[in-house]
């Protein structure tokens, strides 16, 4: 089967409730919601959609409920050129739903209803979708399903990136070893990468020895650090942040866009930072996605040269 897709994203497609508060309430208390919006999200869908807007041919494997059929969200993904033929439909379940709370300091707490995603673990490995992609991104989702997808992709020599995100706590040590062991690029925020190292009893050097030649550790507005044979510090592009939700997923999509075009790691990180800087300027994960030209323009304004991508 020919590789007619650049990037397959595996993991959650979700309906998001983005909720803003002044501060998180203590147990047994309440607090006022300043504003709330019902938007589209899910880490895998975010990566697929941002990647598509950046010119990648993307595909998506998620478990969705009957409410996804005929929805505006399905229409959006299809009209964006994303291949969703391998989506797992659980007709009598609801599509996963995220409730993302953000305080005035942009700290976040998320509550996630798995719904149809509970059926990931029993689903068949999406062999055709993996075969048809040059690279596979394992996003938040069921650990056993992600491990199976990663191992099948590795057997075919695919490029694999892995970002367990907020589902990291669901991985056993054995599952984490399997997923880390098959990936080329490991993404995580600094809390997550530190937890992964702790869970596997390794430092960054030991983590890279387990599989990923590249480990990307993000720090929000403080930027990111790329660990490979070198250690590369990437600055975040200063913007007026409205909502940080989805910035990490867009960073990963931007990074993979540059990486799959053969860019060096510093350019990958800088392009990722440029893409993410758009997402924080509006509420939600998919409301302010740049195209390649817009991201390149912001990259050039920040770093003084046009990226060779």
Swiss-Prot record:
Catalytic residues identified in the record: 249 (proton acceptor)
Nucleotide-binding in keyword set? yes
Enumerate the residues binding ATP. Answer: 108, 189, 217-223
- Domain of life (superkingdom): Archaea
User: Pfam families, per this entry?
Assistant: PfkB
Q: Which GO terms describe its biological process?
A: phosphate-containing compound metabolic process
Q: Which Gene3D superfamilies match?
A: 3.40.1190.20
EC no. given is: 2.7.1.-
- Protein's job: Catalyzes the phosphorylation of a wide range of nucleosides to yield nucleoside monophosphates, using ATP, ITP or GTP as phosphate donor.
Q: How does it assemble?
A: Homodimer.
Q: Which family does it belong to?
A: Belongs to the carbohydrate kinase PfkB family.
Q: What is this protein called?
A: Nucleoside kinase
Species this chain originates from = Methanothermobacter thermautotrophicus (strain ATCC 29096 / DSM 1053 / JCM 10044 / NBRC 100330 / Delta H) (Methanobacterium thermoautotrophicum)
């Amino acid at each position: 089967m020919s590789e007619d897709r650049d990037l397959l994203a595996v993991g959650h497609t979700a309906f998001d409730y983005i909720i803003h508060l002044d501060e998180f309430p203590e147990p047994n208390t309440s607090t006022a919601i300043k504003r709330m919006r019902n938007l589209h999200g899910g880490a895998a869908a975010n990566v697929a959609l941002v990647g598509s807007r950046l010119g990648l041919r993307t595909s998506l494997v998620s478990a969705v409920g009957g409410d996804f059929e005929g929805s505006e969200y399905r229409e959006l993904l299809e009209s964006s050129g994303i291949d969703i033929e391998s989506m797992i439909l659980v007709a009598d379940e609801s599509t996963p739903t995220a409730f993302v709370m953000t305080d005035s300091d942009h700290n976040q707490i998320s509550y996630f209803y798995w719904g149809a995603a509970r059926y990931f673990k029993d689903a068949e490995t999406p062999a055709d979708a993996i075969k048809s992609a040059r690279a596979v991104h394992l996003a938040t989702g069921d650990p056993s399903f992600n491990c199976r997808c990663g191992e099948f992709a590795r057997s075919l020599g695919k490029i694999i990136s892995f970002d367990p995100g907020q589902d990291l706590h669901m991985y056993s040590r054995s599952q984490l070893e399997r997923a880390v062991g098959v990936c080329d690029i490991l993404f995580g925020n600094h809390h997550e990468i530190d937890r992964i190292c702790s869970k596997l009893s390794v430092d960054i050097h030991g983590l890279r020895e387990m599989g990923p030649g590249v480990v990307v550790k993000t720090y929000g507005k403080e930027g990111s650090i790329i660990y490979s044979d070198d250690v590369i510090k990437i600055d975040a592009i200063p913007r007026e942040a409205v909502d940080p939700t989805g910035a990490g997923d867009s960073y990963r999509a931007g990074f993979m866009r540059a990486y799959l075009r053969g860019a060096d790691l510093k350019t990958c990180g800088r392009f990722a930072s440029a893409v993410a800087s758009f997402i924080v300027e509006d509420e939600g994960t998919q409301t302010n996605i740049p195209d390649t030209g817009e991201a390149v323009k912001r990259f050039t304004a920040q770093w003084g040269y046009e990226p060779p991508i």
